[in-house]
UniProtKB/Swiss-Prot annotation:
GO BP annotations, alphabetical order: lateral root development; mitotic cell cycle
Region feature Disordered, mapped onto this chain: 1-33, 107-152
Amino acid composition bias (Polar residues), ranges on this chain: 134-152
Chief place where the protein resides: nucleus
Gene behind this protein: MAF1
Protein name per Swiss-Prot or TrEMBL: MFP1 attachment factor 1
Length: 152
């Protein structure tokens, strides 16, 4: 009789575990090393190849872009990690990480292009008008519309 009860209880446990959905837990933070390497590779590509960013700020040589990308990613990872708390589910930290990378990348290319622009400005005069928001008088447009009377 004890064997029958044991077999029935074991069957019940087996059925319960089969009926329960498999719960898989994953953590979004911290990112795996593979993910971090992918971020670095994408940064290198963004910094060293022609893009919208490079049209405005120029490109970096491959070796400089590689070093800069690693530094940007490490600093962003450290900054995001310092904001982490047990209450966060990871998505907020990942957003901080992403924003830090973007901010640092822009700051890097801006600071790199500023000295180049300054030395370039010393060698030749600026081709832009003093206030680019105002229409150019050279084009003959003043921005004003005058009325014209016509005869019927």
């Amino acid at each position: 009789m004890a064997e029958i009860d044991s077999a029935q209880s074991q069957e019940t446990v087996t059925q319960e575990t089969q009926n329960k959905p498999m719960t898989t837990s994953f953590s979004i933070w911290p990112p795996t090393q593979r993910t971090r390497d992918a971020v670095i590779n994408r940064l290198i590509e963004s910094l060293s190849t022609p893009s919208i960013l490079s049209k405005r700020y120029g490109t970096l040589p491959q070796d400089e872009a590689s070093e800069t990308a690693r530094l940007i990613e490490e600093e962003a990872f450290a900054a995001a990690g310092s904001t982490a708390s047990d209450a966060d589910d990871g998505i907020e930290i990942l957003q901080v990480y992403s924003k830090e990378i973007s901010k640092r990348m822009i700051d890097t290319v801006k600071s790199r292009s500023a000295p180049a622009a300054a030395s370039e400005g010393e060698s030749k005069p600026s081709e832009l008008p003093a206030d680019a928001s105002e229409p150019s008088s050279a084009s003959g447009l003043t921005g004003e519309v005058s009325s014209v009377e016509t005869e019927p």
